[in-house]
Amino acid sequence: MGPISKIYFLNNPYPNGHKIVTFNWSGRIDEYGFIWFDFHLKTENYYANDDENDEEEDEDLPDWNSKIVWGNYHTCTLSSNYWGEQRGIRINNLDEKLDFDTIIKNDLFSNDLPSEHHFDDDDLAFSIYLLGHDSCAGHQISFSKKDNNRYDITWTGKIALTYAGDDEFSHDFKAEIFNVEFEGFHYPKTWSPEKATEMFRARLANFEEYEFVDLNPKSNKREYKLDKLKQ
């Protein structure tokens, strides 16, 4: 059994972190030819492995430090696409073809940490449900390639407890995710396979190393994604 994927919210009441039960890493090309990475994670219950009695907790503790408050919200979802928005981190420029292997050799940065307290949540690369619908920014994501097209991912960022009215990105998280497989590139549903082929061929280096995969072979409705050929 390999290492367990976890996310740590620094200085919260659970120093051993929280197990990640769902993690997805995919790509997407939009109508304009920009290519994005999407990430989605969900944790188990915050208190899943906590056997300590917290009935004597200080009522004056800040929300971040209170097990009772964390227990009220149960789990975390951190995602660029779970709530239907088109967020994520853009990984290409239109004037050059995207080389997947080159991209993942370097850290990704969301470059969305607001410079002032008043910010538009729609400008952020990811949404987060933590202690309510809070805000996160300043993401840095790094990849370590393993065998069989698998990767280990380290993901850090900043959190503001905006659900409680705090716009300061004063909290930090770190996620360590192991043995992850890239799930391929999606494209707009309005595109035909021919249009998708044309757009991907123009935007991706080494296009011959990819293939279109049926998302649901058992369905009468044909939908595809572009995935790397299995080596």
Predicted regions and their residues:
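Surface-exposed helix/loop patches within compact recognition domains
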Residues: 35-142
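Short secondary-structure subsegments characteristic of cysteine-rich extracellular domains
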Residues: 164-187
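Polar/acidic, low-complexity leader/linker segments enriched in S/T/G and N/D
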Residues: 1-56
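Flexible, membrane-facing loop/turn or short amphipathic-helix motifs
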Residues: 129-130, 160-166
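A short, structured loop/turn motif at beta-sheet edges
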Residues: 142-152, 179-181
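Generic short beta-strand segments
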Residues: 42-44, 154-160
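Short amphipathic beta-strand and strand-loop transition segments with alternating hydrophobic
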Residues: 17-28, 137-145, 158
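Intrinsically disordered, low-complexity terminal/linker regions enriched in Pro/Ser/Gly
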Residues: 187-231
